[in-house]
Regions:
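C-terminal/peripheral segments of proteins
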Residues: 23-503, 509, 513-697
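Sec-dependent signal peptide recognition
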Residues: 2-8
Length: 697
């Protein structure tokens, strides 16, 4: 019976004439010109045509992935084969992401609602036209609805970056550790006299973090850039006049409240309030194809959902945007940002401040640059950062927040005297040097006060060159210099050379000859990173550096080693470990750290930002031979020079497609290995010269 119902559902979908008619209307006159890297260049008469074709294009390059993301956003991923998503499904229901998406859909302006409808119409139309390209395991997800897109955006924002379940917390932490880079260089600092912009988010190379590159061309719009799969708009992009990128910031977007239970409710200001209780049943597919039911019972207070209960207390979670003033305008804001023609229009576009947890680094043809500490921070009624990062009393309304810090009160570095801005997921205070935004002028809960090694290296690269050429800009964007080495080797090497440990003395010679890079040919780099791991292991919870970081010397601290004896012992152990595993302690970085996909295998260049490396690659998949394959880091990379004509180059190292059998799964991997970018073609004439195929609607 179940199989028959499934077949009838698919028949209804594939013969759904009203949707087909809507699709044809939205798409009429639209073209997709696919270039030789699998990038869709969409030419349409209006935004709905763009949206339709973008949905179609995403299905063509990422169809099965997109449908898996829809299932996950519905909180129903556990229903499908080969899924292990029960924790994630439970988290989706706990946060009520679907319910918030339904409320958001009802609140969308007419134009964005039509955009969403056209986008999902394109998705569904592709599935009807190419059913053989849809995997059996995800076909039942169809059809996709507009609310699914908003639920997915909620999941990306609230269930991964601002808050995360047990399952996703490790992914979120790994992503934050790798971080993102952003640069904007004003004409006064550029050798050509034109503004330069670097877009460089670092995300895992799979699942909901997957990028797709595209171009939108319609009256009033000529936008190139990238979007995460299942986004109906370009999220990091540029037009002929301006561009922007995002880096996740240090805002505290969630709070934990301790509630005092009383009967079936909880106390607030001395009054017992009832919980809102909802029950959801998740169908979980078993290995034999049968299903079992898993029940999720969510108790929700005024603060948010209850996560734990014990001894008359409960722990409730408040997430900015979900529990408090709603944030339903992100899609409109991204669209308006892409249509802006100058700084004033762009500033007006971002004023609603609807994109949670994201900085905006901006540059334009007129020479303006900016680093805006964007996203949403509640106006907190009391306490400093440490107070709100702990568990807050939930029995008094005095700790509840009901409004957000307004746009005009958020930190912004605009057109600084230095001629450059940067962000590497550090707080807004050190976006440039000399510093122009001071933490003393803002609430203490707004941002942390620290600067990690990677953003220090970012600032160092920009500040070292008073006249940056295009080639230097690209070279510096691929820098693998390990700033950590500069801070600790001056203590480690003399101590190791004087040591009685033969392995440590030999290792010191290797590190002395090492180029302090994480390039593929850098001999000694694996030894250095293994040593740092060993050193940290020997000092759990203890100070690592002789001089800790301090904001009076933000670019020269931390420095030195707190315990040289432990460091020397760690070096001997690291040398022994690397030798046993790889045959030599001076093995090259690229011999251990690899770029692998679909049978291709290249030496890697780049490392984790923990080491102060600007070009970030994360190698978290360990192979049987002890080597590691890249699974994240530099994902979308684009460099733009706002010259006439505009010059741009980009890269998605893992390719612009995930569909099995697509040549565009691997055609950019060699470029990544060589530290190169591909050209961005924006004019029809350029695209026609590099045309793979053409589609008309």
């Amino acid at each position: 019976m179940r199989k028959r119902l499934f077949s009838l559902t698919l028949f209804a979908f594939f013969h759904a004439t009203p949707v087909a008619s809507q699709s044809k209307t939205a798409a009429r006159g639209t073209q997709i010109l696919w270039d030789t890297y699998g990038v869709p260049h969409i030419f349409a008469k209006d935004r709905n045509g763009l949206a339709y074709a973008f949905g179609w294009a995403q299905m063509q390059n990422h169809g099965d992935l997109l449908l898996r993301l829809v299932a996950q956003a519905r909180g129903r991923a556990s229903e499908y084969p080969n899924a292990d998503y029960l924790d994630e499904d439970r988290w989706v229901w706990t946060l009520d992401l679907r319910g918030d998406a339904e409320r958001s859909l009802a609140a969308q302006p007419r134009a964005i609602r039509a955009h969403l409808d056209a986008f999902v119409a394109g998705i569904n139309a592709f599935a009807r036209a190419h059913p053989k390209l849809i995997g059996d395991s995800v076909r039942a997800v169809l059809p996709v609805q507009a609310v699914d897109v908003l639920a997915h955006l909620n999941r990306v924002t609230y269930a991964r970056f601002l808050s995360s379940s047990t399952r996703t917390r490790d992914d979120a932490r790994a992503w934050r550790d790798r971080g993102s880079n952003a640069w904007a260089v004003a004409p006064k600092r550029s050798a050509s006299g034109h503004t330069l912009l670097l877009q460089n988010p670092h995300l895992p190379w799979s699942d909901l973090f997957t990028w797709i590159e595209a171009q939108y061309v319609a009256p009033g719009v000529n936008l190139s850039g990238a979007a995460l799969v299942l986004s109906p708009v370009l999220e990091i992009a540029f037009n002929d006049n301006l561009g922007w990128t995002h880096t996740t910031n240090t805002q505290d977007g969630e709070d934990l409240y301790e509630l005092t239970l009383s009967g079936d409710g909880y106390l607030l200001d001395g009054v017992v309030r009832p919980f809102e209780v909802r029950t959801h049943v998740i169908r979980v597919r078993q290995a034999d194809g049968t299903f079992r039911d898993d029940t999720v019972r969510v108790r929700r207070s005024l603060h948010g959902p209850v996560l734990e209960e014990k001894a008359g207390k409960a722990l409730a979670l408040a997430v900015v945007g979900l529990h408090g003033p709603p944030l339903y305008g992100a899609l409109t804001q991204w669209w308006d940002m892409g249509r802006a023609r100058n700084f004033d229009e762009f500033r007006a576009a971002i004023r609603p401040n609807q994109i949670s947890g994201q900085n905006i680094t901006y540059g334009d043809r007129d020479g303006h640059i900016m680093m805006f500490y964007g996203g949403n921070t509640p106006v907190r009624p009391r306490g400093d950062r440490s107070y709100w990062e702990g568990v807050v009393r939930g029995d008094s309304s005095s700790t509840l927040w009901t409004s957000l810090v307004p746009f005009q009160d958020m930190p912004k570095t605009v057109d600084p005297p230095s001629g450059w801005v940067q962000n590497g997921n550090d707080p807004p205070w050190w976006a440039t040097f000399p510093v122009v935004v001071h933490p003393e002028n803002f609430p203490s809960y707004l941002a942390t006060r620290t600067m990690a090694l990677r953003p220090q290296q970012s600032a160092r690269l920009l500040d070292a060159d008073s006249s940056i050429t295009w080639d230097e800009f690209l070279r510096d964007a691929n820098s693998t210099h390990m700033l950590l080495a500069d801070r600790v080797l001056h203590d480690l090497l003399p101590a190791a050379k004087a040591s009685s440990l033969p392995d440590a003395r030999a290792a010191a010679k290797i590190l002395e000859a090492w180029d302090r890079q994480a390039d593929s040919s850098s001999k000694g780099a694996p030894l250095f990173t293994k040593w740092w791991t060993e050193y940290k292991r020997r000092r759990p919870g203890q100070r690592l550096y002789a001089t800790p970081w301090n904001e009076r010397s933000p670019r020269t601290t931390p420095d030195g080693l707190a315990d040289t004896a432990a460091a020397v012992a760690a070096l001997g152990a690291a040398a022994d470990s690397v030798t046993r595993r790889y045959g030599s302690a001076d093995v090259a970085w690229g011999s251990v750290y690899r770029l692998r996909r679909d049978g291709l295998d290249f030496a890697g260049s780049g490392a984790d930002g923990e080491y102060g490396v600007f070009r970030v690659l994360g190698y978290s998949r360990k192979e049987p031979n002890g080597k590691f394959s890249a699974t994240g880091g530099a994902s979308w990379v684009a460099a733009i020079e706002f010259a006439r004509p505009l010059r741009a180059a980009s890269l998605i190292g893992y390719g612009n497609a995930s569909r099995a059998g697509s040549p565009h799964r691997t055609d950019q991997l060699a470029l990544l290995a060589r530290k190169e970018l591909k050209p961005v073609w924006r004019t029809r004439a350029e695209i026609e010269k590099h045309l793979e195929k053409r589609e008309h609607f």
